[in-house]
Amino acid sequence: MNNSVDFGGRPFHFIGIGGIGMSALAYVLAKRQLPVSGSDLRPNHITRKLESIGAHIFSRQEASNLEFFGSKVSSTEIELNTQEMFPLGKSTLPQVVCSTAINSNNLEYQAAIELGCPILHRSDVLAALINDYHSVAVAGTHGKTTTSSMIGYMLLEAGLDPTIIVGGEVNAWEGNARLGQSPYLVAEADESDGSLVKHAPEIGIITNIELDHPDHYDTLEEVVDIFQTFAKGCKTLIGSVDCATVRELLRTAASDRQQPTITYSLHQDTEADYTVTNIDCRADGTTALVWEKGKALGVLKLKLLSRHNLSNALAAVAVGRLVGLEFGEIAKGIAGFEGARRRFEFRGEVDGITFIDDYAHHPSEIRATLAAARLQARPGQRVVAIFQPHRYSRTLTFLEEFSESFSHADLVVLTDIYSAGEPNLGLISGEQLAEKIAQEHPQVVYQPTLSTVCEYLLKNLRPGDLALFLGAGNLNQAIPEIITTLCEPATATL
């Protein structure tokens, strides 16, 4: 792929523009008044939003889509002719942006090669934007979206008007991206396909490191190598020493490269730069006293639940102090942050049943989310975990870990595996995972499809239940159907 990105007015065409990562980039480019087009086989509210700001969206993927900003040719034309499609020459060829999910058989991808279009991975575009700004890039196996969104919100509330690119939708800016008018950029930096190594921000954050994405990585050591390369490119590195792997990486960065490093921890005895005491996690939020190099800064209040979100907030505190904010400004921004969508998101309440949507799909994330749910649950209230496994490779790799992740749930409802495009090799199934979980947790029910999940829950949810829909697939599509059906004899709070 061509790594050179032209922000000088040359068009961008995104293959699969409706994806959460692709659409955020397209939004920022379109808001910068650059020509943007894209295709997606499943138009959604995100593609409609892009259309509203001037992007042209195709609902089919075909070669002729690439000529939208060139001369108009028929979509039925068989022969691709660069001179006919782009009479002003190759300088008008669009820059074609794709993600790892796009394979070489894609018609638009093949046409881009034949026409000689510059082909960019989405990480190339993000890396170029990171280089264009005073940038903060948030990396880590878990907590990237919440941490980057929180930092973005904090800077926004402090009047710094940042550009923000994250992997989830945030109500504060009604989407997964916003274009600011200041030199600041906050971005979520994804490690799933190894492209994290392309980013060289002024401030880099590593929240934690674990093995994940077994479709790309075989060992934890391979994951660490990617984060080490990312760390080398950061002018200043911030990380949590509560993760042993991050702690070692920070130590190496500080000693071998004399790189400025800033550390944070939930434990005051770690000698981290930012620590907390007096932690109080309650159903309505989390508070703690924040310390900076042994000096008390003040009390931090979060609307978000649990210790892992307090850790994310400490990363935000470190960034705020680094860019010159007073603690009062930092605390105000963090206190107002309500979280990102699909991150312990309240979706409704009907007949006393509370519905929560969460993106958790890794064993560690499930444990943390269910622990937060148990904290919020009232005495006697059931925590019902409805989980859709994500990818065959992840389910097989972490089979043992998944079986131990549901201890805080009173009832587990498991669906079949959401493939996310992976082939089913017959090595693992949702039913096998259910059987494995049942060895540790007796209250497990297997319901393979969204329709059977809905049927089961409508019959078995009780008033007072806290129902959590967990997974990175399409399980959350069942929530509106269940709420709507329950609403027929009652009134829901939405």
Curated annotation (Swiss-Prot):
Residues annotated to bind ATP: 140-146
> Which GO terms are recorded in the biological process aspect for this UniProt protein?
cell division; cell wall organization; peptidoglycan biosynthetic process; regulation of cell shape
User: Which UniProt key words apply to this protein?
Assistant: ATP-binding, Cell cycle, Cell division, Cell shape, Cell wall biogenesis/degradation, Cytoplasm, Ligase, Nucleotide-binding, Peptidoglycan synthesis
Pathway listed: Cell wall biogenesis; peptidoglycan biosynthesis
So which domain of life are we looking at? Bacteria
Identify which top EC class this enzyme belongs to: ligase
Q: Where in the cell is it found?
A: Cytoplasm
| One GO cellular component, as annotated | cytoplasm
**What EC number(s) does the entry state?**
6.3.2.8
Please give the Gene Ontology molecular function terms for this protein: ATP binding; UDP-N-acetylmuramate-L-alanine ligase activity
Q: Which SUPFAM superfamilies match?
A: MurCD N-terminal domain, MurD-like peptide ligases, catalytic domain, MurD-like peptide ligases, peptide-binding domain
- The answer to whether keyword Chloroplast applies is no
Q: What family does this belong to?
A: Belongs to the MurCDEF family.
Functionally, this protein is described as follows: Cell wall formation.
UniProt-recorded name of the protein? UDP-N-acetylmuramate--L-alanine ligase
Which organism is this protein's natural source? Trichormus variabilis (strain ATCC 29413 / PCC 7937) (Anabaena variabilis)
The taxonomy runs: Bacteria, Bacillati, Cyanobacteriota, Cyanophyceae, Nostocales
